[in-house]
Amino acid sequence: MMSKLGVLLTICLLLFPLFALPQDGDQPADRPAERMQDDISSEQNSLLEKRVTDRCCKGKRECGRWCRDHSRCCGRR
């Protein structure tokens, strides 16, 4: 009786992690089309673009440090 219980426990412990872990096809890195749809970029979001522009621009020729570091100043890409 104890050996049967041990075998059953061993089988359960070996099989459970295989089903509990996500499979390779379920990883976001394997689904680039879905990642691109979920990507929220400033090109798609005008409110974010406005916030970045307001944060960067101090004048026509002057850019803030954050804006220079991120290659965005006064609407330039």
From Swiss-Prot:
Proregion positions: 23-51
Xref: Pfam families: Conotoxin
Tissue: Expressed by the venom duct.
Signal peptide: 1-22
Compartments (UniProt record): Secreted
InterPro entries to which the protein is assigned, alphabetical: Conotoxin
Keyword Secreted among UniProt keywords: yes
Disulphide linkage map: 56-67, 57-73, 63-74
Compositionally biased residues, Basic and acidic residues: 28-38
Residue numbers carrying Cysteine amide: 74
This protein's record includes keyword Signal: yes
Domain free text: The cysteine framework is III (CC-C-C-CC).
Remaining remarks: Negative results: does not block rNav1.7/SCN9A, and rNav1.8/SCN10A.
The protein's name in its UniProt record: Mu-conotoxin BuIIIA
Taxonomic lineage of the native organism: Eukaryota, Metazoa, Spiralia, Lophotrochozoa, Mollusca
